[in-house]
Amino acid sequence: MKTLVGFYILCFLIGQDLPFLAADDVNVINDSTQNLCFANRLSDFLPPPYSNISDNMPCTPLWNTFVLRYSENRDNVMTIIVSALYTTGWVGIGFSKEGRMVGSSAMIGWISKKGHAKIKQYYLQGTERDQVVPDQGELQLQKVPPVVALHGAMIYLAFQVKFAVRVPRRAVILAFSTAYPSKLGRLTKHDDKTTVIVDFSKASGATSIKTTTSTEKTKHGVMAILGWGFLLPVGAILARYLRHKDPLWYYLHIGFQFTGFIFGLAAVILGIQLYNRIQPDIPAHRGIGIFLLVLSTLQVLAFFARPQKETKMRRYWNWYHHWIGRISLFFGAVNIVLGIRMADNGGDGWKIGYGFVLSVTLLAFVVLEIFRIRGTIGSPSSRSPPSFETHPSSSTSV
């Protein structure tokens, strides 16, 4: 019991319409590409001033995994953040009056083999390699330094540029290469490229997608809290402190545990669907979720493989069942806290809600344990039951 109280105290402390696009060879944009807009919060890793405005920028999936975020002020200064999946080489975005690569100016970014972030402006005088001139171009970059950042599997290029006139629709060139530029900054030939026409006058393109994703996150969180934060802990409490009500405690325990398992399974399924849509960089939350699915499945299978009370194996089964249950509840609580902290729409509501559930559960454990030690509850004889005592036809956890 002391171990469980410590686990929950630890968890409590931890808790403290798309713009118009046209292209000559743009691939079909699926839901997974669209939801790259919401995979990461740019304010978490981009420096100011990009971090101050990036979360409110219109977000447009353009081509393959290229995603464009932008904002423009009254002085025609545009803040642009372009991102794409990255392994090696370089990625770039260029601007051209006619949409042609020759004569365009481009911002190219990459992470060197030594892990250094590089970003340069290039002027494309022609199609030959020596005609792609580094540190030249017609883009009027502002005093704010351009930056390039690698976060998870995505690379982000951010810069500010001033255009002479406000043009709602602009030709944007996108390209990438898996080969690094030379030490002198000379670009290698691109592996693929495309040109798109972006309507920068539209600023509400991603609302419907974000709303859908936010709803799915809410469902995922509710299922996880109901399953791992409420039903399964209550089932464990019933198994430990209601055994003087035999066999009622057993049927209640089984009912709560199986219902909690169903809710937990639903949370995992919704989580997998969310991950496939938005590809977030959450290895800890995702890994613990899969780990919990394995543990909870083992608990269900253990129920059907429960040996008779008189057999020698029953003691070892009890140990297994109890400790797997305790470990599952601990990691379930930790993963709920991680999910709330990483949710971009979490707010105080989730923290207060789960904080209340966690506090009530912890208080119930403490009060009931005091009664159990005094012999008021916990066994038919009103005495503290021996360690791992089980009903002949039952299974317990925690």
UniProtKB/Swiss-Prot annotation:
Residues 1-23 form the signal peptide. Heme b 2 binds at residues 253, 321. Heme b 1 binds at residues 220, 285. It is a multi-pass membrane protein. GO terms for molecular function: metal ion binding. The chain crosses the membrane at residues 222-242, 252-272, 287-307, 320-340, 351-371. It comes from the Eukaryota. Gene3D superfamilies: 1.20.120.1770. Keywords: Electron transport, Heme, Iron, Membrane, Metal-binding, Signal, Transmembrane, Transmembrane helix, Transport. It is found in: Membrane. Its main location: membrane. GO terms for cellular component: membrane. Residues 64-177 form the DOMON domain. Residues 184-377 form the Cytochrome b561 domain. InterPro entries: Cyt_b561/ferric_Rdtase_TM, DOH_DOMON, DOMON_domain. Its cofactor is heme b. Binds 2 heme b groups non-covalently. SMART domains: B561 (SM00665), DoH (SM00664). DOMON domain could bind catecholamines and thereby could regulate the cytochrome b561 domain function. DOMON domain could bind one heme b. May act as a catecholamine-responsive trans-membrane electron transporter. This is Cytochrome b561 and DOMON domain-containing protein At3g61750. It comes from Arabidopsis thaliana (Mouse-ear cress).
